Regions:
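Loop-rich catalytic cores of soluble enzymes, especially ATP-dependent carboxylate-amine ligases
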Residues: 140-319
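Terminal catalytic/cofactor-binding subdomain
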Residues: 1-172, 177, 211, 322, ...
Length: 465
């Protein structure tokens, strides 16, 4: 670590840690950020902007949950282009415009249980499907736009998205077609780095079981997870996917992120392209090469949060919510829409037992305790496995005999200990493992038999609600 910057990184780490609770108040809560491709009658990316008025006037006919049925939605507008609607916020759930005009994000939670999450999520999804149906459109349980390629024309007209396209080029435009299934799980301050490391280490487990994007731009790719595979060797691939090694602590986390280029800088409400290493931004813009005990200049921490927001590793800590965000899953098939959320929560709840198993199974003999960061000896094998499962899914050789079954069993036991019966939601994953076929492998077979229209037909959410 750069000696002149160490105190700066340490100070930023202290401020970052303060956004997480000293201890959790009861069982972990879970939230969900689920992205869905929406396609028009021809199967091409629709324009989400046409859905807002239909969602606003749509009547909620879903059953009330404990959190209440649909409350009125409030329009959220872009800070720069105030004519642009970027989302609709309600008490139980919200909708948000995504990078691509044809992708919409559903946000639900935090919820006390997966069943509470499922109830609110289903209400939001039913309302979305009804609105899309009025235009003859389809909402897909799939991880990418199946027919429309990533283009600048598909980019949502948020000012910051244009700035990111200017600096990242094709790597940013890729996000105009992708659709992930993410979860937010609350974590305490003391465990934050350990959970972050573990969440990244589990990326290949999630991809193996939940990849669902082999068909992109109407063509069959070589990957079960096309949305992950595209970024492995991309120019900005270091910002995406599984990290190269575990972080020793939060100071190390800040230091590692600071060695990446800052993509944006703030000028009033606008975000403009940047490009310098964030460590240089700290030094040149904030005089951040401080001596011990010197206070950071105003705006330094906000600049770090802006930088951190545009790094998309498989797991990342979110100061706004005090959570770990888990990101590797593609959007799931419409008949198994809770599978990834259940897996995410089970992994976090079972972290200690799963980590102990992984270390025993994968760490080279005699190396388990040599590194200051737990599980670092397992990292190279899991990184290799990550690349294999992106390509081959559950056909990839496991890093140890029965590896996935053991991890899934430990996640299941962890959910069972919560006492809500949530472990039932892992049933689709057990079926996938038994068949050795994840959704991406299944979609590959559908495409080979029925083409891209067959893929859209089996991914159509309306058929399963």
């Amino acid at each position: 670590m750069e000696p002149s910057q160490h105190n700066v990184y340490e100070s930023l780490a202290v401020q970052f840690a303060a956004h997480f609770p000293a201890r959790l108040q009861g069982p972990r809560t879970v939230g969900r950020e689920a992205e869905f491709p929406v396609v028009d009658e021809a199967g091409r990316a629709a324009d989400i902007d046409r859905l807002w008025p239909l969602l606003l006037k749509g009547e909620d006919t879903a059953k009330s949950s404990e959190r209440g049925s649909l409350s009125p939605l409030k329009v959220k507008r872009d800070a720069v282009n105030t004519d642009l609607i970027v989302g609709l916020d309600g008490d139980s759930y919200s909708y948000a415009l995504e990078v691509g005009k044809g992708t919409i994000e559903l946000n639900v939670g935090p919820c006390a249980t997966l069943f509470e999450l499922e109830s609110a999520f289903r209400s939001a999804l039913e309302r979305l499907v009804r609105a899309a149906g009025q235009l003859g459109w389809r909402v897909l349980g799939y991880g990418v736009q199946p027919l429309s390629p990533p283009t600048r024309a598909l980019l949502s007209p948020k000012q910051r998205y244009g700035a990111l396209a200017d600096i990242m080029g094709a790597d940013w435009l890729w996000y105009t077609v992708t659709a992930s299934d993410q979860a937010q799980v609350d974590v305490s301050r003391a465990e934050a780095v350990s959970v972050l490391n573990f969440g990244n280490l589990m990326a290949p487990v999630v991809v193996a079981l939940c990849a669902n994007s082999p068909v992109v731009a109407g063509e069959l790719t070589d990957d079960c997870s096309g949305r992950e595979g595209r970024m492995i060797d991309a120019p900005y691939g270091q910002r995406h996917g599984m990290i190269d090694r575990p972080y020793a602590d939060l100071t190390d986390f800040v230091a590692c992120l600071s060695r990446l280029p800052a993509l944006l800088r703030r000028e009033g409400e606008r975000l403009l392209p940047e490009g310098r290493l964030f460590s240089d931004v700290l030094r040149e813009d904030y005089g951040a090469a401080t001596s011990e005990g010197a206070a950071l200049s105003s705006g330094c921490f906000d600049a770090f949060l802006l930088h951190d927001h545009y790094i998309w590793h498989s797991a990342r800590l979110r100061t706004a919510y005090g959570t770990v965000e888990l990101r590797p899953a593609c959007q799931q098939p419409p008949h198994e829409l809770m599978a990834a959320a259940a897996l995410y929560l089970g992994l976090v709840e079972g972290r200690e037992e799963i980590a102990a198993y992984v270390e025993a199974a994968l760490a080279p003999a005699g190396e388990e305790k040599e590194d200051s960061a737990p599980l670092s000896a397992c990292w190279p094998r899991m990184k290799h496995y990550h690349e294999q499962v992106i390509r081959a899914g559950l056909a990839a050789p496991e890093p140890a005999p029965g590896f996935l079954a053991e991890v899934l069993a430990l996640a299941e036991a962890a959910l069972a200990r919560r006492g809500y019966g949530e472990e039932r939601m892992l049933a689709p994953l057990w079926r996938r493992l038994e068949r050795r076929e994840n959704p991406g492998q299944w979609v590959r077979r559908v495409f080979e038999a029925e083409g891209v229209e067959g893929v859209m037909e089996v991914s159509d959410v309306e058929a399963y609600l």
